[in-house]
Amino acid sequence: MKKLTFIVALIMAPVLVSAQNQFDSFEDENDVTSVVVTKNMFKLLSKMDLDSEDPEAKEYLDMVDNLENIKVFTTENSAVAKKMDAAVAKYVANSKDLGELMRVKNDGKNIKFYSKEGKNENFVSELLMHLSGDIDGKKMTVIMSITGNIDLKQISKLTSELNVPGSEELKNIKTNKKTK
């Protein structure tokens, strides 16, 4: 049984790694601004001595303690934007557990949110946002990937603080109405 488990793990490892590395190549791309926040940073944040009496601060610390990573890739370069669009389309097509959560078309922006189910209807294990369009008068493409145990009711607060374009739409997510 141990051998079978080990063999299955070896077979699945490249699939799992490729999902996480699907967008990492943009980190080294010219004309791409990237922000990658890892589990180590979230651990540091959760250990900060914030006012423990404040329930909002406690919710925030609990939320970041459950996150694995946040990756944001942004470009104004149209050629790179096409690569990013193709990477998102490929990732969504190849991720059978990833379902569309919400679409927003507003003020010259197209924003799509995708998610993988989490421990219950208020949580997801992955949240992917793909934005293309006009942001502050500039044509931009943004990919945001968040993994971990993500509370949909709380994540908009964090992404707003990170100033991720399009993240303001997260506050409109209805947690109990996901579609596949």
Feature roles, as predicted:
Residues 149-180:
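C-terminal partner/receptor-binding element of secreted or periplasmic proteins
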Residues 4, 15, 40, 75-78, ...:
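Generic structural motif
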Residues 30-36, 64-70, 74-75, 93-111, ...:
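Extended interaction-bearing regions that mediate binding to partners or small molecules
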Residues 45, 57-61, 72, 88, ...:
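Amphipathic, non-transmembrane alpha-helical stretches in extra-cytosolic proteins
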